[in-house]
Regions:
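Bacterial N-terminal signal peptides that target proteins for export
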Residues: 1-8
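Bacterial N-terminal signal peptides
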Residues: 8-17
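An exposed, glycine/acidic-rich loop-and-rim segment of catalytic or binding clefts
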Residues: 23-56, 60-303
Length: 304
């Protein structure tokens, strides 16, 4: 199996820190390069910053986390998330870097589902599935800003009934909050007018070394999981779980990401590396730690 340069993608609340609406950024991003109009709505770059000077930048296009400046063990601030430095690339290159993905992250086969005896046919991407809620999805929408302070940004998107086949008008409120202790809270709230399926997520890619071209294979990862969602050869979930014991997916004892990534394993071969959903042992309890990532060179730790 070929060796892969990979980024860490964590699809839940992030315990690192965050940027506020000023005219300059520590990451070097220019707010002017995010000032545009997409589908008749203005886009901007918003900056959150705490008293320690830690900064995160967010754009309302896709409610995306654009940059996250975090200190290493010596206090040097570096960007630890992958992204572009302008709105045009986010709009045209089709990547979900830092985006809010919805209505449903992942794939739905068919693509259809049944709720209360009613079957809903969803948008087909040409491969018999709908992926990440379809196109355009939440990542391709310009969100409304409904509140902003020094350390908080609140965004809203209203998905109309029937968008990409999903039932119900879905109103999503997303709040980014930068706390004084250095934690970044990412909070989703959604209400619907009909019974529906919702699976929202942030799609940030992390490299906590602070160097976007450096492999993450030397970073140590711990995940509180005994099993993953099994994929078929087309990278669609089978509905079965795959036990991680005695496989490269067992991170219950922390080890380097690259330690087993080149092992001959059917699930690894399907995805070309680690790109799976880990079933947490404490499902539904957000007070429990799900995963910890550590970079020895920089001293940074990411906890979710």
């Amino acid at each position: 199996m070929k060796k892969h340069l990979i980024y860490i993608i964590l699809l839940s609340a992030m315990l690192l820190t965050l940027c506020h609406g000023q005219t300059h950024t520590l990451s070097g991003l220019s707010p002017q390069r995010f000032a545009s109009t997409i589908e008749g709505k203005p886009t901007s770059l918003y900056i959150l910053r705490n008293s320690k000077g830690i900064e995160a930048c967010i754009t309302n296009y896709g409610a995306r986390l654009v940059s996250l400046m975090e200190p290493d063990r010596n206090g040097k601030l570096e960007d630890v998330v992958l992204g572009y430095d302008n709105i045009t690339d986010y709009h045209t290159k089709g990547q979900n870097f830092g985006a809010t993905v919805g209505r449903y992250i992942g794939r739905i086969i068919g693509p259809k589902f049944t709720i209360d005896s009613t079957t809903y046919t969803l948008q087909d991407n040409g491969k018999g599935v709908i992926s990440h809620g379809g196109n355009p999805g939440f990542a391709n929408r310009v969100w409304d800003i409904i509140d902003q302070t020094e350390q908080k940004l609140v965004l809203r998107y209203i998905s109309p009934d029937g968008e990409n086949g999903f039932p119900g008008k879905l109103t999503t409120i997303l709040t980014y909050t930068l706390l004084e202790d250095g934690a970044l809270e990412v909070d989703f709230q959604a209400t619907t007018t009909k019974a529906t399926h919702v699976n929202l997520s942030n799609h940030s890619f992390f490299n906590i070394s602070g160097n976007p071209v450096q492999s993450v294979e030397a970073q140590y990862l711990w995940i509180d999981s005994k099993k993953i969602a099994e994929y078929d050869q087309h990278k669609n979930v089978t509905g079965h779980f795959y036990k991680v014991r005695h496989t490269p997916f067992d991170f219950r004892k922390p080890h380097a990401i690259g330690e087993r990534i080149n092992n001959d394993n059917e699930q690894l071969n399907i995805t070309g590396g680690y790109d799976h959903a880990f079933a947490l042992r404490h499902s539904g309890d957000i007070s429990k730690t799900a995963a910890i990532l550590f970079d020895a060179k920089s001293g940074r730790t990411l906890t979710t």
